[in-house]
Amino acid sequence: MKFYIKTFGCQMNVNDSEKMAGILQTLGYTPTENWEEADVILVNTCSVREKPDQKVLSALGEFKKVKKHNPNAVIGVCGCLAQRAGYEIYQKAPFIDIVFGTTNIHHLPNLLEEAKSGNKAIEILEEIDENENLLDQFPTVRENKYTAFVTVIRGCDKKCTYCIVPTTRGRERSRRIGDILREVQYLVEDGVKEIHLIGQNVTAYGKDFGDVKFWELLKAVAEVDGVERIRFTTGHPRDLDEDTIKVMADLPQICEALHLPIQAGSDRILQAMDRGYTQKEYLQKIELLKKYIPNIALSTDIIVGFPGETYEDYLETVKVIKEVEYDQVFAFKYSPRPGTPAADLPMTESPEELSKRLNDLINLQKDITFKKNLEYQDKIVEILVEEINQENKLVGRTRTNKLVYAEGSPEYLGKLVNVKIEKVNRFSLEGSIIGGD
């Protein structure tokens, strides 16, 4: 029996899908890259913007075809969209067999058994399942052998007016350090070199416990023998403190890269979003980061066209981009999410104007990214070789999260090696291996 999982959305969803794959393998299923031959198809959904919603329904329409030659195939929908609108999805696609949300993934074996018995298995919990940590006991099935996501906190207590995540993922719930370290140890023994700590608001880790802080978790993970690199995503600017930044600077395992979403540069819009900081306060965090970690590579998220945004507000965002000089910016037009406070606010600019602002912003960032990449020309950088591509190039990332294609021997796969950068592109670097461990 075979399974296929289609994943939309963030790293948390990717990690959830890895856990689902682990559950299915435990049940005797094997993965397939061809959904047409799958006995179980799961669609792990995202609800952060409208476009992923549409993609999910399109994918389901395609997957429906599997039932023609395999009537007993099970099709399931899970994740954030399922948590928010699972019953609506089922009404639109009644051929679905399973629907479940974000906190009861560990119920998948029971739901699958119910569906295989010929029943519809729909379980969307209004409250967080008190046994959701049982999910962490299952192995992950990863595409990447040498890097791994580790969920350290679930949910978000922030109430940003545009965001559906607190509704779909619930309040913040941290995992105990001991549980996290056991998972990290298992991953290292499985060959993982780089640990990527993730959460909807990873820098809030431990606040619900009151007896442990995020920087203490970073130190503990760094002490696990065999952990060569540590990254973490995504933090909220309000929860990033100087103690954490100092630990980032002090621990050699922590990579010099950080994703710190600003969302908008205008204080008026930031207040309307209920982000809890001003432009000045955000830039003070950036200043601290650059003070302690001068070579840090920064990335951010930006929403263009939040209700009420004027051109002057937009220019404040442009000003921040120019001042910070991010290595990467993930920018999107505002997408109203049903059930959020901002969804009731009227749009004040035309779609054409918002598209122009977004395109101008993206083009500005492309130039900044290329300028930042040019600094790597003829430099020697460390990469973790993660794979070999179809052109027989080694593929890896620098500590600053730059994608590198390198000439070198396959023996370097899974190793930290030095690469001399010989060519700089807008979104990647190219070079040759000059040594390895």
Swiss-Prot record:
The keyword Disulfide bond does not apply. GO terms for molecular function: 4 iron, 4 sulfur cluster binding; metal ion binding; N6-isopentenyladenosine methylthiotransferase activity. SMART domains: Elp3 (SM00729). [4Fe-4S] cluster 2 binds at C156, C160, C163. Pfam families: Radical_SAM (PF04055), TRAM (PF01938), UPF0004 (PF00919). [4Fe-4S] cluster 1 binds at C10, C46, C80. It is an enzyme of class 2 (transferase). Its main location: cytoplasm. Keywords: 4Fe-4S, Cytoplasm, Iron, Iron-sulfur, Metal-binding, S-adenosyl-L-methionine, Transferase, tRNA processing. One of its GO terms (cellular component) is cytosol. NCBIfam families: miaB-methiolase, MiaB/RimO family radical SAM methylthiotransferase. Monomer. This is tRNA-2-methylthio-N(6)-dimethylallyladenosine synthase. It comes from Sulfurihydrogenibium sp. (strain YO3AOP1). The lineage of its organism: Bacteria, Pseudomonadati, Aquificota, Aquificia, Aquificales.
